[in-house]
UniProtKB/Swiss-Prot annotation:
Enzyme class: transferase
Gene Ontology biological-process annotations: cell division; cell wall organization; peptidoglycan biosynthetic process; regulation of cell shape
Location in the cell: Cell inner membrane
Species of origin: Maricaulis maris (strain MCS10)
Membrane topology: Multi-pass membrane protein
Family classification: Belongs to the glycosyltransferase 4 family. MraY subfamily.
Pathway(s) of this molecule: Cell wall biogenesis; peptidoglycan biosynthesis
Protein known as: Phospho-N-acetylmuramoyl-pentapeptide-transferase
Principal cellular location given in the protein's record: membrane
The keyword Transmembrane belongs to this UniProt entry's keyword annotation: yes
Keyword tags: Cell cycle, Cell division, Cell inner membrane, Cell membrane, Cell shape, Cell wall biogenesis/degradation, Magnesium, Membrane, Metal-binding, Peptidoglycan synthesis, Transferase, Transmembrane, Transmembrane helix
Membrane-spanning residues: 28-48, 75-95, 96-116, 134-154, 175-195, 206-226, 243-263, 271-291, 295-315, 344-364
Record-linked CDD domains: GT_MraY
Gene behind the chain: mraY
One cellular-component annotation, GO: plasma membrane
Amino acid sequence: MLYLLFAPLADDFQLANLFRYITFRTGGALMTAMLIAFVFGKPMIGWLRRKQGKGQPIRAEGIERHVVEKAGTPTMGGFLILLGVMVGTLLWADLTNAYVWIVIFVTAGFGVIGFIDDYLKVTKQTTAGFGGRFKLVGEFAIALIAVVWATHTARSLGVEPGIETSIAVPFFKDLMINIGPLFFVFGCVVIVGSGNAVNMTDGLDGLAIVPVMIAAATFGVIAYVVGRVDFAEYLQVHYTAGAGEILIFCGALIGAGIGFLWWNAPPAMVFMGDTGSLSLGGALGTIAVAIKHELVLAIVGGLFVLELVSVMVQVASFKLFGKRVFRMAPIHHHFEKKGWAEPTIVIRFWIIAVILALIGLATLKLR
């Protein structure tokens, strides 16, 4: 909004010229979202605590100490993140940019699904929540709209025919595999998979939000690079007109994440719930699809992939062979069962997220 107000005045007022710079507006979005999370965090947590009573239900068959230590902690803290992200983005981004709206659409849509899931868990005091099939149908419907919207946007901006339905292979120069209509299925799987992978990761205080911020920072940089002709040509990556504005959304996400972490740091005063984890994961997946770096998401978000795969392996192994591969899934609970302290798991997973992010950034140069 501020961009549309001040950018046209740049020729007459030197200060207004700052609003033409994506980096300046990203900083503004980050600070705005962070302040919102700081200021509204305490009253929102108090309101959630009063409304929810017993808070988020804790799995009785899970980690024993969680039943005692985490019982009564309110959930739906994702509202705080979404508030900061939305206000920060809408205030500082170019609202004529389609990619901004695509990411906002998925973030909000997945947030609604997550809210329904959280609401059912809290009101019924069960860990079951929203039915898995209904949940997936809703997620795939939202993801399909986003993928179609993104490919249409790419075509309207004049990308080379076929690029909009192609997959870029990291570490290989100009290697784009056009999979045609299958891209719509692939894109949906990326977005839905990302949303649920982050959701699986959100099981310990601070575990999910920091890797999400790290991934957002990484993809913000990549979006900025592919959104500039000069950088894209120098690094020999495909150019995506308008993608640079996604950096502003990423900045808002990081700012809101920092503010949320203030309240989610151990011992957590609030959990983000599915309201936050599904929406943030969906946002990361959508960004990856929009800037044609879907496979890089598997690297940068490798921690999320590991968490999701651990659950899939656990379920498949038990159904097929009647045996569990892990002591408990997702895998962070496996390490808890082995006796690792919660802060040890969280910090080590953060370190892994940083390493994977650096590898993901290296794909820009190593080709």
